[in-house]
Amino acid sequence: GGGMMVLNPETLSLKYFAQGGDGDAELFQKGHIFCVRPDEKENLWIGTSQGLFCYNRQAKQIKHFTSANSQLPEGNVYEVSFDSTGKGWIATETGMCIYDPASQSLRSNVFPEGFVHRDKVRTIYEDTGHNLYFIREKGSLFTSTLTMDRFRNRSVFSTLPDNSLMSIVEDNQGWLWVACNDGLLRIKEEGEEYDAFTFNDGVPGPTFTNGAAYKDEKGILWFGNTKGLI
């Protein structure tokens, strides 16, 4: 890994993140950093190969969650996603947990039977209807309400290979765009049918990059593809 660097937007200079403890210096210079996400209090959450870090930028303090001092499942922390209620969804190599902002703790014992908390989840996304979508390393698209009282596998993707889903984003018209390793799909949240976009539609390459989908302030969608940015 190459650690984590901080960009100064005024000078365009880069420097290594150096706010961790003495034992964390090597991680932030040479270790594996998988994701960096802000919460509603402007803390930065950093998923790494050595656990989960929460950095308070105002106080310049950092907290380190591991499987030894919390209910964080073991392994690499691949995804951190905060929903519209402020709750944090944490996905690791071996499963999931939830960050409860009220108790400021991680909890892995809150999931109902049949949920995806034991799978390797790589992407978690909330749409404007407050539905959550989980993209696993293997398996179909999984969707749930914020309270986990209703959840299911999306049967529309049952014909796709298990490892084909890469990223997801919603456009301003309510369509969900799902990037795969064999093209780009567009679906309606309530529908079970989809439109497929391939080379004939201007997609430069069939394979999209894991987790690389973004909607900007103008509503334009951006996707990472092995042939470049589209």
Listing of model-derived features with the role each one plays in the protein:
Residues 1-230:
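Carboxylate-rich, polar loop motifs that coordinate divalent cations or form catalytic acidic clusters
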